Protein backbone atom coordinates (compact mmCIF):
# COMPACT_ATOMS: atom_id res chain seq x y z
CA UNK A 1 0.00 0.00 0.00
CA UNK A 2 1.26 3.49 -0.68
CA UNK A 3 2.04 5.91 2.12
CA UNK A 4 -0.97 8.03 2.99
CA UNK A 5 -4.44 7.71 4.46
CA UNK A 6 -6.63 4.68 3.87
CA UNK A 7 -10.38 4.73 4.57
CA UNK A 8 -12.42 1.57 4.96
CA UNK A 9 -16.22 1.71 4.71
CA UNK A 10 -18.77 -1.04 4.11
CA UNK A 11 -20.91 -0.21 1.08
CA UNK A 12 -23.12 -3.30 0.92
CA UNK A 13 -24.16 -5.81 3.58
CA UNK A 14 -25.22 -9.42 2.96
CA UNK A 15 -28.97 -9.94 2.70
CA UNK A 16 -30.56 -9.96 6.14
CA UNK A 17 -27.78 -7.90 7.73
CA UNK A 18 -27.38 -4.19 8.39
CA UNK A 19 -24.60 -2.08 6.86
CA UNK A 20 -21.92 -1.05 9.34
CA UNK A 21 -22.01 2.74 8.94
CA UNK A 22 -18.66 3.38 10.64
CA UNK A 23 -15.78 4.71 8.56
CA UNK A 24 -12.34 3.43 9.59
CA UNK A 25 -9.36 5.68 8.88
CA UNK A 26 -5.80 4.30 8.86
CA UNK A 27 -2.69 6.45 8.38
CA UNK A 28 0.14 4.60 6.68
CA UNK A 29 3.59 6.10 7.30
CA UNK A 30 7.15 4.99 6.83
CA UNK A 31 10.06 5.49 9.18
CA UNK A 32 12.42 4.95 6.23
CA UNK A 33 14.34 2.31 8.20
CA UNK A 34 13.48 -0.49 5.76
CA UNK A 35 11.26 -2.42 8.19
CA UNK A 36 7.96 -3.88 7.10
CA UNK A 37 4.79 -2.13 8.07
CA UNK A 38 2.01 -4.43 9.26
CA UNK A 39 -1.50 -3.33 10.04
CA UNK A 40 -4.25 -5.79 10.92
CA UNK A 41 -7.80 -4.74 10.24
CA UNK A 42 -10.11 -6.40 12.73
CA UNK A 43 -13.56 -6.71 11.28
CA UNK A 44 -16.04 -5.15 13.71
CA UNK A 45 -18.73 -7.38 15.11
CA UNK A 46 -22.14 -6.20 14.02
CA UNK A 47 -24.83 -8.27 15.68
CA UNK A 48 -27.48 -9.55 13.32
CA UNK A 49 -30.86 -8.11 14.17
CA UNK A 50 -32.81 -11.17 13.22
CA UNK A 51 -36.42 -11.90 13.89
CA UNK A 52 -38.02 -15.21 14.78
CA UNK A 53 -41.55 -16.48 14.18
CA UNK A 54 -43.02 -18.60 16.98
CA UNK A 55 -45.86 -20.95 15.99
CA UNK A 56 -48.32 -22.65 18.35
CA UNK A 57 -50.64 -25.37 17.04
CA UNK A 58 -53.93 -26.26 18.79
CA UNK A 59 -57.14 -28.15 18.18
CA UNK A 60 -59.93 -25.77 17.19
CA UNK A 61 -61.92 -24.51 20.16
CA UNK A 62 -59.75 -26.33 22.71
CA UNK A 63 -56.50 -25.82 24.57
CA UNK A 64 -55.25 -29.20 23.33
CA UNK A 65 -51.88 -28.72 21.59
CA UNK A 66 -50.98 -30.72 18.48
CA UNK A 67 -47.60 -32.38 18.17
CA UNK A 68 -46.26 -33.41 14.76
CA UNK A 69 -47.73 -30.67 12.54
CA UNK A 70 -45.30 -29.57 9.80
CA UNK A 71 -45.06 -25.96 8.59
CA UNK A 72 -43.27 -24.69 5.50
CA UNK A 73 -41.57 -21.29 5.26
CA UNK A 74 -40.84 -19.81 1.84
CA UNK A 75 -38.05 -17.27 2.23
CA UNK A 76 -37.63 -14.06 0.19
CA UNK A 77 -35.10 -15.81 -2.08
CA UNK A 78 -37.61 -18.60 -2.88
CA UNK A 79 -35.93 -21.33 -0.83
CA UNK A 80 -38.03 -23.27 1.67
CA UNK A 81 -37.53 -24.79 5.09
CA UNK A 82 -39.82 -26.84 7.32
CA UNK A 83 -40.27 -27.21 11.07
CA UNK A 84 -42.38 -29.64 13.10
CA UNK A 85 -44.32 -28.85 16.26
CA UNK A 86 -43.02 -30.44 19.45
CA UNK A 87 -44.90 -31.98 22.39
CA UNK A 88 -45.98 -28.45 23.42
CA UNK A 89 -47.45 -27.80 19.97
CA UNK A 90 -44.71 -25.24 19.32
CA UNK A 91 -42.09 -24.63 16.66
CA UNK A 92 -40.01 -21.70 15.45
CA UNK A 93 -38.58 -20.25 12.25
CA UNK A 94 -35.39 -18.40 13.15
CA UNK A 95 -33.55 -15.52 11.53
CA UNK A 96 -36.21 -14.06 9.25
CA UNK A 97 -34.39 -11.90 6.69
CA UNK A 98 -35.66 -8.84 4.88
CA UNK A 99 -38.30 -9.37 2.22
CA UNK A 100 -41.54 -11.29 1.74
CA UNK A 101 -42.17 -14.55 3.61
CA UNK A 102 -44.91 -17.17 3.27
CA UNK A 103 -45.99 -19.67 5.94
CA UNK A 104 -48.30 -22.63 5.37
CA UNK A 105 -49.11 -25.90 7.06
CA UNK A 106 -48.12 -28.92 4.96
CA UNK A 107 -49.03 -31.92 7.12
CA UNK A 108 -50.71 -32.89 10.39
CA UNK A 109 -51.30 -36.10 12.35
CA UNK A 110 -53.93 -38.37 10.73
CA UNK A 111 -56.77 -37.37 13.04
CA UNK A 112 -56.72 -33.73 11.85
CA UNK A 113 -57.37 -31.82 8.62
CA UNK A 114 -54.53 -29.65 7.27
CA UNK A 115 -55.30 -25.95 7.65
CA UNK A 116 -55.25 -24.63 4.07
CA UNK A 117 -54.62 -21.02 5.10
CA UNK A 118 -51.49 -19.21 3.91
CA UNK A 119 -49.96 -16.23 5.72
CA UNK A 120 -47.74 -13.83 3.79
CA UNK A 121 -45.78 -11.04 5.50
CA UNK A 122 -42.90 -8.69 4.77
CA UNK A 123 -39.90 -7.88 6.97
CA UNK A 124 -38.59 -4.36 6.27
CA UNK A 125 -34.96 -3.26 6.71
CA UNK A 126 -35.85 -1.66 10.06
CA UNK A 127 -37.16 -5.10 11.19
CA UNK A 128 -40.79 -4.06 11.15
CA UNK A 129 -43.24 -6.72 10.02
CA UNK A 130 -46.25 -6.04 7.82
CA UNK A 131 -48.90 -8.68 7.22
CA UNK A 132 -49.61 -8.85 3.48
CA UNK A 133 -52.31 -11.54 3.45
CA UNK A 134 -53.92 -14.28 5.50
CA UNK A 135 -56.15 -16.69 3.57
CA UNK A 136 -57.19 -18.78 6.59
CA UNK A 137 -60.92 -18.98 7.29
CA UNK A 138 -62.66 -18.38 10.60
CA UNK A 139 -59.61 -16.90 12.38
CA UNK A 140 -57.96 -20.33 12.27
CA UNK A 141 -54.55 -18.66 11.71
CA UNK A 142 -53.86 -15.61 13.85
CA UNK A 143 -50.65 -13.70 13.09
CA UNK A 144 -49.51 -11.18 15.72
CA UNK A 145 -46.63 -8.75 15.92
CA UNK A 146 -45.89 -7.58 19.46
CA UNK A 147 -44.60 -4.09 20.33
CA UNK A 148 -41.08 -5.53 20.78
CA UNK A 149 -41.16 -6.89 17.21
CA UNK A 150 -41.70 -10.52 18.19
CA UNK A 151 -43.92 -12.36 15.70
CA UNK A 152 -46.22 -15.25 16.54
CA UNK A 153 -48.67 -17.40 14.63
CA UNK A 154 -51.44 -19.36 16.33
CA UNK A 155 -52.93 -22.09 14.14
CA UNK A 156 -56.03 -24.19 14.81
CA UNK A 157 -56.98 -27.45 13.12
CA UNK A 158 -60.26 -29.34 13.11
CA UNK A 159 -60.63 -33.05 13.67
CA UNK A 160 -60.96 -35.13 10.52
CA UNK A 161 -64.42 -36.66 10.05
CA UNK A 162 -64.70 -40.38 10.56
CA UNK A 163 -67.35 -43.06 10.53
CA UNK A 164 -67.70 -45.42 13.46
CA UNK A 165 -69.23 -48.78 12.64
CA UNK A 166 -70.13 -51.08 15.53
CA UNK A 167 -70.97 -54.73 14.89
CA UNK A 168 -72.32 -57.18 17.42
CA UNK A 169 -70.97 -60.72 17.11
CA UNK A 170 -71.61 -63.99 18.91
CA UNK A 171 -68.96 -66.15 20.60
CA UNK A 172 -67.98 -67.59 17.18
CA UNK A 173 -67.41 -64.08 15.72
CA UNK A 174 -70.53 -64.29 13.55
CA UNK A 175 -72.28 -60.93 13.09
CA UNK A 176 -75.67 -60.68 14.76
CA UNK A 177 -78.31 -58.75 12.79
CA UNK A 178 -80.80 -56.39 14.39
CA UNK A 179 -78.65 -55.07 17.26
CA UNK A 180 -79.11 -51.35 17.89
CA UNK A 181 -76.67 -49.03 19.62
In which residue ranges do the predicted regions lie?
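Solvent-exposed loop/turn and edge beta-strand elements of beta-rich ligand-binding domains
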Residues: 1-181
